[in-house]
Regions:
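Helix-to-loop junction immediately C-terminal to a conserved catalytic motif
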Residues: 55
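Hydrophobic anchor residue at the start of the ABC signature
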Residues: 135
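Catalytic Walker B motif of ABC-type/P-loop ATPase nucleotide-binding domains
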Residues: 146-150
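Conserved catalytic motifs of ABC-family nucleotide-binding domains
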Residues: 142
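Conserved ABC ATPase "signature" region
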Residues: 14, 102-119
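Conserved ABC ATPase signature
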Residues: 121-125, 129
Length: 180
């Protein structure tokens, strides 16, 4: 396990229970700057729950969690909850919930090779294009810690390879810790 004193996030024997059932238990891990940590397991094994614990979105019933103070986090959820009838263009979508400069948006779109999509509506994007735009949205926040939950879900084989290459390039260029 990586050095915990420099970790962006650390989980130690973390567990979360609903009613009498443990969703995950005994999770110990840390993520440092510039490293990629991948959660592997079948559907329903607790990967998303573990990611949400690391993000601080779910409280734990046992164990401990710690995060670097003022940690900047980017998050790409497994499923996007959006009203597809609302016409919203990519550039606006990226800055929808945070004040982000045009320069930051352009950098994120360029890094994810989606600059050509900036004036397209979200609802017309392919699965791979949407995933890359979602990653651009997270990158635009200049995260130190980036969490991507099932980043290649709904993407064809060729698109999967492109997204994994993008994740590696993101780690290299912005030096963030990444949890997949």
């Amino acid at each position: 396990m990586p050095k915990e004193e420099n970790a962006l996030i650390t989980l130690t024997n973390a567990g979360i229970r609903r009613d009498r059932k443990w969703l995950v238990r005994g999770i110990t891990m840390s993520v440092n700057s510039g490293e990629i940590v991948t959660l592997i397991g079948p559907n329903g094994s607790g990967k998303t729950t573990t990611a949400k614990i690391a993000l601080g979105l779910l409280g734990i019933n046992e164990g401990t969690t710690s995060r670097k103070n003022n940690l900047r986090i980017g998050y790409v959820p497994q499923k996007l909850q959006i009203d597809w009838t609302v016409p919203i263009k990519v550039k606006r979508f990226i800055s929808l919930t945070h004040k982000i400069s045009d320069k930051e948006i352009e950098f994120a779109l360029s890094l994810t090779n989606t600059s050509h999509l900036s004036d397209k509506e979200i609802r017309v994007l392919s699965g791979g294009e949407l995933q890359r735009v979602m990653i651009a949205r997270a990158i635009a926040l200049s995260p130190e810690f980036l969490v991507l939950d099932e980043p290649v879900q709904g993407v064809d084989y060729k698109g999967e390879d492109a997204i994994y290459n993008l994740i590696e390039e993101t780690r290299t260029k912005i030096k963030c810790g990444i949890l997949l």
